[in-house]
Amino acid sequence: MSKGTIYPSESLAFKDARTGAEIRQVTTTFALHHHPFFIIPAYDDEMKRLIFVSHRTGAPQIFVEIRVTGELMQLTDRDDLSEWSVHPSHNGHYVFFTAGTRGWRLDLETLEEVELVNFAATRMREEGMVGAAMGTTALSHDDQWWAIRYNVGKEAALSVIDTETGVYETILQRDRIGHLQFCPDDSNLIYYAGPLTDRVWVINRGGTNNQRLYARNVEKNEWITHESWIPGTRELAFVDWPNGIRCINVDTNQERQITSFNAWHAICNPQGTMMVADTNFPDIGIQIFDPRDNDRKPKTICYAGATSVGEHWAGPFPYADGPIKVYAPQHTHPHPSFSPDSTCIVFTSDRSGHAQIYEVMVPTGIW
């Protein structure tokens, strides 16, 4: 099939066997599917479309579910898509992605693809399956700025692109850059992950004030990972695997504990009132909790049933002496994230033998 092809709805409804939560399976075709990485929204703000990647044509392509009809539409027909780079705009007009060494803006009405930038880089991401190797990108909440990392020789580079003109500025070059995220309350502030032993960094959009926000405790052999912003607070949350989630304020450096269970990939809703996380070793289901109140216990909303491959997560921090090769296919991880209106949570699961996309409804009055 080709760009613009419409597929009938594949939606199936059922209830979680253990929690009774209402779940909708969005895709059913026997192929690999996944929504964007958990730090990237899967919907536009008005929830007209759910954006995802499907391998049903033989290569990863961008698809949407048109939510008013349930139909699926293929948006791209490429052989060079970087499938974890996909980032929908908040206003619902575009999807941004990288392919080859170029950055593209796709119009969701006309399906026109406009090349915004060509880095002519040796490669756009690191080798492997995790972290900087995923090639995720970041879009400011006003949709004006798009941040991309790529390689310049042996170094990583961070560039910020004007989404209208394609004019860009390279604001940082260093040993390792990944998992870029604009602060939801400040389009001039970007989080990025540095080396695995020194991850938590922030930088201004213009390249000034590049600083370490949190220093890993080497004596405790801390495993700091999967950082995400808490809207409305200027706090950056991070997983202290497997001991829970802490956060730190970028202005005051005040730190606090959010929760103490084995949260794996965790992200807030846009309002900053709820947080969701998948779990592993052991998998105790997808959990919802309040990032503002660490005394409130998390609640299990459903069980994704994903294989969550990545045996290195079962032991202590494995990167103390440098990067190691791991096997952790990302489409086997649930990566839950909220819809803009917080009524549902999207996740991926390969429970059926193929990675499919699901939505679970957030119970009303959960608190």
Model-identified regions with their sequence ranges:
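Repeated scaffold domains used in trafficking and secretory/extracellular systems
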Residues: 36-40, 82-87, 127, 132-137, ...
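Asp-box/WD-like beta-propeller blade repeats and closely related beta-sheet repeat scaffolds
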Residues: 80-155, 171-172
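Blade/loop signatures of beta-propeller domains
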Residues: 1-24, 149, 157
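A short helix->beta-strand "capping" segment at the edge of beta-propeller domains
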Residues: 14-35, 318-326
